[in-house]
Swiss-Prot record:
Cellular localization per UniProt: Cell membrane; Bud neck; Bud tip
Subunit-structure text: Forms an heterodimeric complex with RAX2. Also interacts with BUD8 and BUD9.
SMART domains per the UniProt record, alphabetical: RGS
GO terms classed as biological process: axial cellular bud site selection; bipolar cellular bud site selection; protein localization
Protein name: Bud site selection protein RAX1
SUPFAM superfamilies: Regulator of G-protein signaling, RGS
Superkingdom of source: Eukaryota
Modified residues (Phosphoserine): S167
Entry function: Required for the establishment of the bipolar budding pattern. Involved in selecting bud sites at both the distal and proximal poles of daughter cells as well as near previously used division sites on mother cells. The RAX1-RAX2 complex performs the asymmetric localization of the two cortical landmarks, BUD8 and BUD9, at the distal and proximal poles, respectively.
Length: 435
């Protein structure tokens, strides 16, 4: 009960904090934030920068490896705790396994309180005692394992074999150190070995750090989390200092966005994996307001200003009354609105309704994802489809971002009113002269 109350209190405190400031990078990476400052939007934003997206890919894959290691540790810990009870219900094979585990614990090769030491994969640095070797031989015989198997006296491999046989009995999948090693090797091959081998190769990594990690994983066959700590810190610093501020300035200060270009789809040999990752965030539209929304608004605004100037000069040189010349307020309002919104990349109406355009990129082989678009626009008014397309719009769920964009929208409204008033007064108050 106390834990549930603590979680509820923590969630309430987090929601209050999110109303007072923009999120941090860590909050985005652990997926605690909402649109438009969520992890997927951050991923889409980085896809337009060569090699920057690789660091976020590495972070996500490293977190997957970390969760895999933690799950393995938790499974080992629970197995060591529950095994004495299971031993009473099973046969001789379970007895031999129980005796072997007890001997490993007594001689210090295995610590139930710290099973994470298995991740260090230290190998047979500490030799087994004759008693332990005898128990190991009995366990192999009872389990039907050849005497040549597990000859390296590797505790991690022994625990793997025990857990593997337990999983066959209870039908539950188990994580093994082979899976952990395969995951660590995959990280090295994908991000550290060579740019020719992988397009997600991490550049600008110190050679000392790179070589040390490769040697630890591929030669020493280690897979614990601490091996990647230095690279993890470098990745976080790069994302926090170079990438995240640009991301916040893009999505938290603006609610209209031009279509971005994913550089990976313009290179030779694009992989299917990357195509699948970007599916659902691709966008194909013939509307210039959807593809190039800022420049389209500015161009449309200049057109309306030109119309306003033309109407104003015609009415002046035809000596129409000042009351009639006030009609120039309409084209001047539309022109100033479009130009100000395009220059500041803040649509005033969008800010009032609390919506923003999603970051989208065009893929030359992709089509629209109708299902994703419809699910994201259920709460977006149809009237907002005039500029930019309704499918690109999504509701701003982060409270501080919504408040910030509303303030910027108010500032843009003041600029529009001021500019419109100035043009209207000038063309309405100057003396008319018929030519």
């Amino acid at each position: 009960m106390k834990e549930e109350l603590s979680k509820v209190s923590s969630m309430q405190n987090f929601e209050m904090i999110q109303r007072e400031r923009l999120p941090t990078l860590y909050e985005v990476l652990i997926q605690r934030t909402s649109q438009p400052v969520d992890l997927w939007t951050f991923y889409t934003f980085l896809s337009q920068f060569p090699y920057a997206i690789n660091y976020l890919d590495f972070w996500v894959d490293l977190m997957t490896h970390t969760r895999l290691c933690k799950n393995y540790i938790e499974l080992v810990r629970k197995s060591l705790i529950n095994f004495p009870q299971e031993q009473q219900q099973n046969g001789s094979t379970s007895t031999a396994t129980f005796d072997l585990l007890n001997a490993l614990i007594e001689e210090g090769h295995l610590d139930p309180e710290a099973p994470d030491k298995l991740l260090e994969n230290s190998g047979p640095d500490v030799p087994f005692s004759p008693k332990l070797n005898e128990l190991l031989g009995d366990w192999k015989h009872q389990s039907g394992i050849g005497q040549e198997a597990l000859r390296n006296e590797d505790v991690a491999l022994i625990v793997d074999e025990i857990m593997k046989r337990r999983s066959q009995q209870d039908g539950k999948p188990q994580i093994t150190t082979k899976q952990l090693l395969h995951s660590a090797v995959g990280l090295c091959n994908t991000y550290l070995v060579s740019p020719e081998q992988s397009e997600r190769y991490l550049s600008n990594i110190p050679m000392e750090t790179r070589n040390r990690i490769i040697e630890s994983v591929q030669i020493e066959r280690k897979y614990d989390i601490e091996i990647f700590d230095d690279l993890k810190n470098l990745t976080y610093q790069f994302l926090e200092m170079d990438c995240f501020p640009k991301f916040l300035s893009r999505v938290a200060l603006h609610n209209i966005h031009d279509e971005i270009s994913d550089w990976r789809f313009h290179s030779v040999g694009v992989t299917n994996e990357k195509s699948n990752r970007s599916r659902g965030q691709t966008h194909i539209s013939r509307s210039p307001f959807s593809n190039h929304t800022s420049i389209s608004r500015i161009g449309f605004g200049l057109l309306w200003l030109g119309i306003g100037f033309w109407i104003g000069y015609v009415l002046i040189f035809l000596a129409y009354s000042r009351a009639i010349r006030v009609v120039t307020v309409v084209p001047f309002t539309l022109g100033c609105y479009c130009i100000v919104c395009g220059m500041y990349q803040v649509d005033i109406v969008y800010s009032w309704f609390g919506v923003t355009q999603r970051l989208l990129h065009r893929h030359k082989n992709a089509g629209n994802d109708e299902g994703d678009a419809s699910s994201d626009t259920d709460h977006v008014p149809m009237i907002l489809a005039v500029f930019g397309g309704r499918r690109r719009l999504t509701r701003i769920e982060h409270p501080f971002t919504r408040q910030l964009l509303r303030k910027r929208g108010l500032w843009c409204l003041l600029l529009v009113v001021g500019a419109t008033a100035a043009f209207t007064v000038i063309f309405s108050c100057v003396p008319g002269r018929r030519v």
